[in-house]
Every structure is written in structure tokens, then in C-alpha cells.
Amino acid sequence: MENEGKDNGEFSFVSDGGAETGRRGLPKIHTEKNAPTTERDICHDDSTTPMRARTLEHLHSLQKKRSTPTTPLTDSQGVFSPVSEAERQKQQLISISASLASLTRETGPKLVKGDPEKKKEAHKASVLDHLHFGEPILNLSDSALKSTHILYNPSPAELYEQAIKYEKGSFITSTGALATLSGAKTGRSPIDKRVVKDDTTEKELWWGKGSPNIEMDEHTFLINRERAVDYLNSLDKVFVNDQFLNWDPENRIKVRIVSARAYHSLFMHNMCIRPTAGELEDFGTPDFTIYHAGQFPCNRYTHYMTSSTSIDMNLDRKEMVILGTQYAGEMKKGLFSLMHYLMPMRQILSLHSGCNMGKNGDVALFFGLSGTGKTTLSTDHNRYLIGDDEHCWSDNGVSNIEGGCYAKCIDLSREKEPDIWNAIKFGTVLENVVFDEHTREVDYSEKSVTENTRAAYPIEYIPNAKIPCVGPHPKNVILLACDAFGVLPPVSKLSLPQTMYHFISGYTALVAGTEEGVKEPQATFSACFGAAFIMLHPSRYAAMLAEKMKKHGATGWLVNTGWSGGSYGSGNRIKLAYTRKIIDAIHSGALLEANYSKTRVFGLEIPDAIEGVPSHILDPINTWSDKDGYHETLLKLGGLFKKNYEGIHTYQVERDSELAEEILAAGPTL
């Protein structure tokens, strides 16, 4: 190398005996060894492949590829088979437009598939003009002149984007869950729930004293439906979920949920059964539709309305309307009420229960009200979880109604509930929780928004979930009661009439609080352990339960997870370790081999010994130092049972008065 470029400093760059210089004498640098002379005015970087995009807009369009259409259906009986992708999308939109049709104007909205914020031209098959369903009797409204954008079965990732961008109060937590707020209502509003009373439901449904069903007429329902549909059609976009209920393929129900919030769409994506792409192609017309317009109030001056909130169900039209509440649990429990009507019509028993299965195929059902340990005891690492809340029992066995879990989060900890803790990750909806503003770590002990904090996640997030969520006929039916009076045995074997009696009663006790000076436990009863959701008389569900238990040889058990040695305040809570030993003995069949004796008043059969459980606690009288106090409290609880049962025994179970009398006789004797 030779120094020839004095103006360039100490060094110059020489090629083939001479230095190449630019206009100002600076050396040119080539990264390509044999760069053509025509390109020597450009500095090349050949360390990466050339960029294919010409503009930023083009680059962003390359980031996402269009979903590949699934293989066209070959079954000629398929709703959309076999048709082009464009025609299939058009038929989907026609079905959705029919769902959103105004009954007054008899038209459906003009639909566009996709996010309205996307400026690119819509695919020609994804646009549908408003359709007339019959001759219009009024002029079109302004909403008919605009397009309603449909986000159809969006993925969790898409719903995260929608929620965070457009819904105030939506955040990603430190574990990846979506934290959101349900607005003013942080729980269900049972006093605002209405069911249309018509010629059919008047005869079939349970009305009157003790019933959760509050009537409304069809005219009022249609007013609220029109209000909800008009609100949804006025929006720039709505979310549409087409999903299933019931894992039993022979008895599954197709449901459509139309909502205004990404939060509601993701919640139902998690809670209902998620269809495959092929199942969506053949989805067709839904069996039931929910119109969730919860951000818009009902007219409280409309007949049957008592507030700005109304949750209305029309079983004849197969529709549900939600106005004035954004609490997502209304959709879940509304569909559960629907199943409590539809399934018994098919001779299938719908149940508010947990369900698990042993490795040998033995299935157990767990019934229990809040605080009885239903979730804790049905979640067993040695057994498969079929479901935590809603089930059906058909001739095929048991099946979960849902595709997800809706777990309470208050005071949640990794140590107590590791499965729920670990399920709170990307895709999970966290309702009304409080988190650190910087780290986004959730404080599950915080109750400043509500005590009813919840997590909704797919059941696949539970490691030992059984997928598909079905199982054989149950061997054991376990009724859980948290008896704060301290007089029920830790476990009792029930006869069939006793099982029906305690199933209809649905007993537990609320622990005394400090409010209003309450110092004693309070008994609470919820028929079939879910009175708020049943549609028929409790005795009809009990009769079906008895028939199935008798046919398949299931055994009934009453397990007290409450107090022993005295009532709340003087006795002690039965140790969870003892209750788990009892449940294990039920699962293994060991309790069937035990010797039994009968208690007074309730006539319950109690075992004399259980491995791992102190024998003296099995008969509650042994744990009370005040024997007179025990007998007095026992009679008091028996009286509360009898008072609760008044009126129910007059109903003829499936027109079988003898069966009704057997159930009544299985109650306490005072």
C-alpha cells in the first residue's frame, strides 16, 4: 500500500494499484467485491436480503397473511356445502343480518365483515347490503343507511387489540391476562330477569312462590328486543360469536352471541365450546341468540320493568336480550337457564355441579352452594376434571355444558389454588380486579371494586382437564353442605328418597357476620343447588336424578364441610384434610363396605370408621360437650328444613304422588 492521498489523512484505499476517490477526494467503500462500475455511486450493504415492500403501507400489509379457507365440505347435506369461499361468507352474513333484523322495519342491517378502522377495500364477498325479511311496513331508519361492521368469531389476540384500543379500563396484566371492568353492575341482577309467559311456558315452567322465573309478555319482550337491535345496529361494529353448548355431540346446542364489547366476545369465546373452522362453515342458523346491548338501558317505564336493567328470555323465539348491565356472567347463566329448559325436554338432566373422573373411569358429581368446597374438592390432581360448574346427564353419560371455567378470584393464591392461578395467562379475562399501575401485578385480596372478582378461561388451561369433556355414568353423587350449626355428620350415606330430598333442599349455612348484630348462623336453601337458574319445578329435576341414579347404580352422599363440636363461634371447622380423606374413601368404594348407624331427626346413616379420619367426629354428638345444646340445635335445623320444604311436596313429581310422598318422608322427623 502506498500513501498518495495527503488531503485524505494518513491512509488511502488502493485497488489495482490506484486509489478510487470521490468528488471531494474521499475514498469510495464497496461491500461487494465486484461491484459494477454503474453502481459505484451507491454504498451497498449485502448483509441482509432485499426488502420486498416499496412503502410502509405495503410493509404493514405483508405482516398479516389471509387465513387459508378450509377444505370445502363434501357432505351434500351441509348448510353451506360445497360452495366457494365467497359464497360461504355471503351466506354467513345473511344469517347474521337475519339475526340483527328489525322486527318493525323487517330489515337486516347492511353488513361489512372486518374492523371498520381498516382502510383497505373490503373483499367483495364480505359486504352485504341490507336485506328485507318480508315487506317493510315503515321507512328505513338512518341506521339502515350505514354499514355495520361484523367481527365474526375473532381470535383472543384480535379481541385484546380491540379491547385495549377502544374500551377504557382494559389492560394486560403481568401474566398476560386481560383485565377489564363490567361497569356499574359487578354481579348478576336476578330481580331484573324476565321470562316470556305464553301458552307453552305457562304450563311447563315453574311459576309462583319460590320460583326464580318472573313473567313478562311477548309484546314487552319485542319492545326490548327492538331497542337492543337498534342500539347494536347504530354502532360502527359489533362482535358475533357462533359457538356450541354441551360436549355431547348428539345433544349440543348452537348459540350466537351478538355483543358490543370485545370483553363480552372474549368472555363467551372462553366460556362456550369453540367450533373448529370446519364446524363454522356448517354452522348455519343458530338454535339460540343472545343480544347483549348492556351499555344501553331499558326503558324503565315499559311494562314489567322495575329498573334500567332487564335480562329477558323468550323460549319460543329462542332469544335473549340484555339491557342495562355489562356483567358478562348474565350471558353464561342465561344460557344455563336455557339448558335447564331444553335438556329435560329431551329426557336429559341438567345439573349445577362439578364433575371429575378417576383413572379407572369412575365419575363423581359434586353439588354445593358457594363456600361449600365444590371447586376445591372436584379439582383433584389424581382425577380428570370434566367440568367445574354445569353438566348434563344423558343416556350417553355425563358431559360438560361449557368450554371454560368462571372462577372466583378473591383472595386467590398460588398455594391454595395452583390450577386457577396458573390458568390466569394470555386469553384469560379478569373481571373487576385491582392491579399495580406500573408492574400490572394483580392484588387478589383487593376488594375496592367488588368482592366478586372473577377469571374466565378455557378449560384446556387446566392441566388435568379431560378433553373432550365427557364421561361415563356417575358412580357417586356428592351433596356438599357447609353446616355452620355443627349438627350434620361429616359424611352420610343417603337412600334414594333422601338424595332427592336434600337435592331439592339445596342446604348450606351462611356464617354469621357483624352487620346488624347477627350472632348466629343463617340457613340458606337453593333448590337443586342452583335455584336461580332452574326453569322447571325442582321435583322434576329430582325425579330425573333419582331415575338415573337407580338405573346406573349411583350412590348418594351428604358431606358436611362446615362445623363440628359446636356451631360457628364455639365449634371448629372440619379440617379439609379429613374431608379429602372422606372423598377419597367415596371414590375408592371403601365407604360402601363400612358399618353404619342411623342418626336422630334426619335419619342419616353414618359410618363407624374411615381411614385417616378420627372416628369420634363421625357422629357429631360425640364432639359436643353440651349435649342438650346439640339436641336443641339439631331440632332447630330440622325445623328450618321442614319450613323450607313447605309447598314443594304438594307438587306431584311427574304426576307421581307416591314418589312425592317418599321424598317428603325422607326429611327430618321432629
UniProtKB/Swiss-Prot annotation:
Cotyledons, leaves and roots. Residues 29-47 have a biased composition (Basic and acidic residues). The keyword Ribosomal protein does not apply. It catalyses: oxaloacetate + ATP = phosphoenolpyruvate + ADP + CO2. It is an enzyme of class 4 (lyase). Keywords: ATP-binding, Cytoplasm, Decarboxylase, Gluconeogenesis, Lyase, Nucleotide-binding. This is Phosphoenolpyruvate carboxykinase (ATP). It comes from Cucumis sativus (Cucumber).
